[in-house]
Amino acid sequence: MKCHNPFGFRVGPVTFWTIIIYLALLVPLLWIHETVPPAPSSPTPTPGINLTEAWHDLTTITKHYHPYNSRDNERVGDYILERIAAILDRNDVNWTLEKTGARNVDVTLELSSRSSSAPSVTVFDDNLANVTWATDIGMLGDHTAGVGTYFEGTNKLVYIRGTEDEQGEWWKSGKNDVRVIGKGGVLVNAHYDSVASGYGATDDGMGCVSILQILNYFTTQGRQPKRGLLLLFNNGEEDGLLGAKAFANSPLFSFPTTFVNLEGAGAGGRAVLFRSSDEQVTKAYQKAPHPFGLVVASDGFSMGLVKSQTDFVVWDDIFGQRGLDIAFYRPRPRYHTDQDDTRHASPASLWHMLSNSIAAVKSLSDNTHTFSGQRSDGDRRKVPSGSHASKGVWFDMFGKGFAVFGLRGLFAWSLTLLIVSPLILAILVFILNRHDKLYFFSRKINVHNEGSEDPVSIGGFRGFTRFPIAVGFSGALTLASAFLLTKINPMIVYSSEYAVWGMMLSLFYVSLWMTLKGSSAVRPSALQRGYIHIWLFIVSWGLLIVVAVTEDRLKIASGYPVVFLHSALFLSTVISFLELFGLTKKHDYARRAHDDHQVRDRIGELPHDDALIAPDTPNDEAEDSDGEDSEHEPTETTPLRAGGDSRVRSTFGTAYRSVFTRKSSPDKHKPFENEQPWSGRLPGWTWILQFLLLAPINVILWGQIGLFAVAATQAGGADGGSVLTTYLIIAVLSIVILVPLAPFIHRVHYYVPIILFAAFAGTLIYNLIAFPFSANNRYKIYFVQEIDVSDGSTKVSLTGLDKYVHSVIGELPSTSGKVITCTDSNARSGLVDCSYDGSAVPPLLHGGLENGTVTVTNKRYQHLVSVNITRSNDSKNRATLSINAADSKVCTVIFDQPVSNFAIRGSEGLDSRLGQYPDAGVGSLRLFRRDWTSPWVVDVEWNDQHKVGEVALETDKPVDKDAVEELRKRAGISGTIKCHYSDANVPETIPAFHECLQYSPDWAAFSKADVGLVRPVKRF
């Protein structure tokens, strides 16, 4: 019994190994994407870490909604201070507690516990710092109307002194210059506020409890860091990264030169390395026990493809520190909803963030030389964090290893490949040609001399055009399926991304197999694998040019898979050329074939019993029909003279040549099926080397990118984004992931495409007809209720896709018989705002009860917002607004005419680091305060030129209410005040919101549409 080579280029081995290797790559990728490494079985895996304690802290912090503008937010802040004190006392640490704020405010000692002249730890309860700025640049870098912001912070900070830090209480020096203090330190940041519609378990409760455990870890005996740590629990992140910006006026501002930002942009899963400042700081993350992340996420933020921001942009872009952004990023449907709770989180996710962040913080703290000194950009307004290294390129390997290298190195690698790879192939072509073994592109050989009438066909062009035709056809079908889903059922990817992946992968595989296998069956060619390699090399070389340009000019690192792909294709293509050295020289083969034909022709003139065998003419006719190579390859039945008419041969000659063929073709060099006779000497095992070069790295890198990109964008359609983008990502990456199969797929057994065609049919039907949402993948709708305080009327607005918003509104009892008005949303492009009368579910805000019932007069809400205007005597274009809101910390002033300047009484003044005052003036002003009663006093100035200047008011003259309208006309000050109410912990407070939660379908979720859930509106 004959034993075949298990790695031979035959149907069985190719089918087996391609399936096994792809499954061995794709299954782990999916497993890592969907699961989280388990938490240690012991609650104390290392001294200084207690997971049971951390989980208890998380459940306590997330007991209620706790946005900045809520009573429960204050509870969380107090709890964090209590936990800090308990940890420090338990670890027997000398520490002090200080009240601190702006740098020009005297620091006073509030409480001392085990205090000394140089405490090991200092806790700062910052209830003094404030920050003011104006800008016309949005958080995503887009231009907006001018917006001013005033924010009063309530940040909690812990300074852990490092062994190499400056001694004493250096923050009391009173110096306002930006300088390196000692060797600098490491900032670890998380925010303790949640959105009004979510409990904040992962956004950002896990970040907060991770910092508490980091405090426990580094204050445990023997764990003092080298460079000091500054642990920051900031407040107000959800309303515009406000807590981080308030740190600008902290006396500790200049100390940290590096940072680790802990965030949640999803609701569980693994914590991904979202962004990093540069290569050097990214190497700190290499120490992580379970690294997870890729540079594509960072480039997505840089290019504005990710429509959200984290505090990273403040630390890195504005303050100039260098650091890491570690965040949860999926599942996005639970983000900012009531499912961001501990029920839908897990200790494993908490451990993943905690263990990785501790490793990164320790590595940054131990590095005492890299991250301090003069900046490369010379910006004196930013922290001196040393010269930035090259932008980093990074990706994890199955959640275990982590590769980091510089973008400059990647560019050098790309440039080298662009020059060297085609040069080496050209040299190989030259050598093969010199040795007369370049079978590629060879049609025929003239045995005697050029112009001979009896050339021998080589068939070297056969298979040349198959790849572009096959990929063009298969790729077009795959891309067409993306447009089909976008047209018929655009939201299906929201909950069923794997069904979409399965449909497009199977479609491309089946169509590619049909075209390449079909052409190979009709006209077999031993060079098909080599020609496909040549085509792939050319395409990847062209892509590499684009990647090199983006690396050099745009500093985009996401093209690294193309560099790896081209490297693998280059080596694999080299193998295809080296295989030709095993063949006989073309002229030697042609002479031998020519001589064999002559012998057979002479023998064919003799009568023989085999003359009764009919000639095999149909195969000859079939070969004539192939347009790729008009010449026959020489076989024992080919006429000596190329192009001669075989009909002149006798039946005896044809029959004898058939017998001669069977006797003269030894099995040792027998070609595969009906491929060219000379191909029998090609090695049959080299294909597995090529496949191992092409498939693993390509599938791993592109598979990671595909899974991450789809997870990050699949919910974008619900927010008004283009769903086509997500489908095109899946379609293109399906092509890229499977294209390494192209050189070998014509040897795959037909059972595989039959099975995949059935999978395609099933997933196609499902994707076209299935409802796109479910209880585990809820559609997110944005809620806000607005009150006109002048007449007490109220309306509820739900923002989302028209079709689904109407379905939800129809389920709400209070909407029965109400008129629903829908208009295109101004705030969220692609969505609609659907409003209805909210009088049946009026908000019960401060003072809204009379004798235990909701008041129904049109004056019931007038007390919520108050504004008093005083006009300056020295200028008709200056005035002062005193604004207050009952039981709210947040208001927004919208001016009818932009103001050229504003100042908040008691503020630090405009901070130019956070934005330049818009030339066109400020059209709206956002106001945040830390208490519930102190009014905002705002001085404003307006003129035609909208010039920026100081506001210096003289004697003020009060203006009574009857004169307000006259003041609007004469002085030009008028507008609207919207105050915000965010506390939905008591259902009766905002019954419209709780009605939505209670009565809407289980596939619907609700998130805040504005700073608050309710906004009373008052004209002034």
Curated annotation (Swiss-Prot):
<dbReference type="Pfam" id="PF04389">
    <property type="entry name" value="Peptidase_M28"/>
</dbReference>
<feature type="transmembrane region" description="Helical; Name=2">
    <location>
        <begin position="411"/>
        <end position="431"/>
    </location>
</feature>
<dbReference type="GO" id="GO:0046872">
    <property type="term" value="F:metal ion binding"/>
</dbReference>
<feature type="transmembrane region" description="Helical; Name=7">
    <location>
        <begin position="691"/>
        <end position="711"/>
    </location>
</feature>
<keyword id="KW-0378">Hydrolase</keyword>
<feature type="glycosylation site" description="N-linked (GlcNAc...) asparagine">
    <location>
        <position position="873"/>
    </location>
</feature>
<feature type="topological domain" description="Cytoplasmic">
    <location>
        <begin position="1"/>
        <end position="11"/>
    </location>
</feature>
<feature type="topological domain" description="Cytoplasmic">
    <location>
        <begin position="746"/>
        <end position="750"/>
    </location>
</feature>
<feature type="binding site">
    <location>
        <position position="336"/>
    </location>
    <ligand>
        <name>Zn(2+) 2</name>
    </ligand>
</feature>
<feature type="topological domain" description="Cytoplasmic">
    <location>
        <begin position="513"/>
        <end position="529"/>
    </location>
</feature>
<keyword id="KW-0482">Metalloprotease</keyword>
<feature type="transmembrane region" description="Helical; Name=8">
    <location>
        <begin position="725"/>
        <end position="745"/>
    </location>
</feature>
<feature type="binding site">
    <location>
        <position position="203"/>
    </location>
    <ligand>
        <name>Zn(2+) 1</name>
    </ligand>
</feature>
<feature type="topological domain" description="Cytoplasmic">
    <location>
        <begin position="432"/>
        <end position="467"/>
    </location>
</feature>
<feature type="transmembrane region" description="Helical; Name=1">
    <location>
        <begin position="12"/>
        <end position="32"/>
    </location>
</feature>
<keyword id="KW-0472">Membrane</keyword>
<keyword id="KW-0926">Vacuole</keyword>
<dbReference type="InterPro" id="IPR045175">
    <property type="entry name" value="M28_fam"/>
</dbReference>
<feature type="binding site">
    <location>
        <position position="191"/>
    </location>
    <ligand>
        <name>Zn(2+) 1</name>
    </ligand>
</feature>
<feature type="binding site">
    <location>
        <position position="238"/>
    </location>
    <ligand>
        <name>Zn(2+) 2</name>
    </ligand>
</feature>
<dbReference type="GO" id="GO:0005774">
    <property type="term" value="C:vacuolar membrane"/>
</dbReference>
<feature type="topological domain" description="Vacuolar">
    <location>
        <begin position="33"/>
        <end position="410"/>
    </location>
</feature>
<keyword id="KW-0812">Transmembrane</keyword>
<feature type="compositionally biased region" description="Acidic residues">
    <location>
        <begin position="618"/>
        <end position="631"/>
    </location>
</feature>
<dbReference type="Pfam" id="PF22251">
    <property type="entry name" value="PFF1_TM"/>
</dbReference>
<feature type="glycosylation site" description="N-linked (GlcNAc...) asparagine">
    <location>
        <position position="868"/>
    </location>
</feature>
<feature type="transmembrane region" description="Helical; Name=9">
    <location>
        <begin position="751"/>
        <end position="771"/>
    </location>
</feature>
<dbReference type="GO" id="GO:0006508">
    <property type="term" value="P:proteolysis"/>
</dbReference>
<feature type="transmembrane region" description="Helical; Name=6">
    <location>
        <begin position="562"/>
        <end position="582"/>
    </location>
</feature>
<dbReference type="GO" id="GO:0008235">
    <property type="term" value="F:metalloexopeptidase activity"/>
</dbReference>
<feature type="topological domain" description="Vacuolar">
    <location>
        <begin position="551"/>
        <end position="561"/>
    </location>
</feature>
<feature type="transmembrane region" description="Helical; Name=3">
    <location>
        <begin position="468"/>
        <end position="488"/>
    </location>
</feature>
<comment type="function">
    <text>May be involved in vacuolar sorting and osmoregulation.</text>
</comment>
<feature type="glycosylation site" description="N-linked (GlcNAc...) asparagine">
    <location>
        <position position="851"/>
    </location>
</feature>
<feature type="transmembrane region" description="Helical; Name=4">
    <location>
        <begin position="492"/>
        <end position="512"/>
    </location>
</feature>
<feature type="binding site">
    <location>
        <position position="263"/>
    </location>
    <ligand>
        <name>Zn(2+) 1</name>
    </ligand>
</feature>
<comment type="similarity">
    <text>Belongs to the peptidase M28 family.</text>
</comment>
<dbReference type="InterPro" id="IPR007484">
    <property type="entry name" value="Peptidase_M28"/>
</dbReference>
<feature type="active site" description="Proton acceptor">
    <location>
        <position position="237"/>
    </location>
</feature>
<feature type="region of interest" description="Disordered">
    <location>
        <begin position="609"/>
        <end position="648"/>
    </location>
</feature>
<dbReference type="InterPro" id="IPR053975">
    <property type="entry name" value="PFF1_C"/>
</dbReference>
<keyword id="KW-0645">Protease</keyword>
